Amino acid sequence: GIITGCDKAFVVDKNDKNLQKINGKFLKNWIKNKDIGKYIINNSQSMLIYSNDIKNEEEEEFLVETFLKPYKQKLQNRRECRRNYRKWYELQWGREKYLFEQKKIMYPYKSRSNKFAIDIDNTYGSADIYSFYIKDEYKNEFSYEYLVGLLNSKTYDKYFKIIGKEMGKKVFDYYPNKIMKLKIFKDENYDEIEALSKEVVSLSRQKIMVSNELNTYINECNGK
């Protein structure tokens, strides 16, 4: 995931009215470890300012002055800025955008159980999140829905805990080197597993949509 070096500067509430005044190309969906559930990513109220795309800070004066300038001293004191590897307004480690701007599976770096979620919204994540995508040569062999169906199953939860490392209090670390050791099987039940997993994903997304609608009505009632 991304290391900002100062979340207060780069991570903002998506309801902040000032966001309407800046170019949308600098705003990315942003989640942390806690936002990942089984199968889907829960709604996050945060956006990331991807300031590495700023070519000239003077041209983006409102963005810089409003969100970044208040933390300039702290941003300048980051190691990479002191060594002139980064401009003061850039993310500490912004990573390559293509890693985030594609369909992928995201998962937390530590958890008590397997939590693998499909992302279709080009979501960016913090350093406590890992992700992977299906290589082109395997896209006709496996679907994302099939994979999360396997990985979130009780069988694969037990499987991972055999090879994974417990950090304490039944919390396991999910470092990529361990995840990549998991064997993925495919047999005559593939279509059924995929179909059931697609159903779970669909129902989970519907649940979030209904929950959001409910909260909207309640907020409107409280505002009267």
PLM features: what roles do these ranges have?
Residues G1-E192:
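Polybasic, glycine- and aromatic-enriched phosphate-binding surface used to engage nucleic acids
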Residues I184-K224:
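Non-catalytic DNA-recognition/assembly elements of restriction-modification systems
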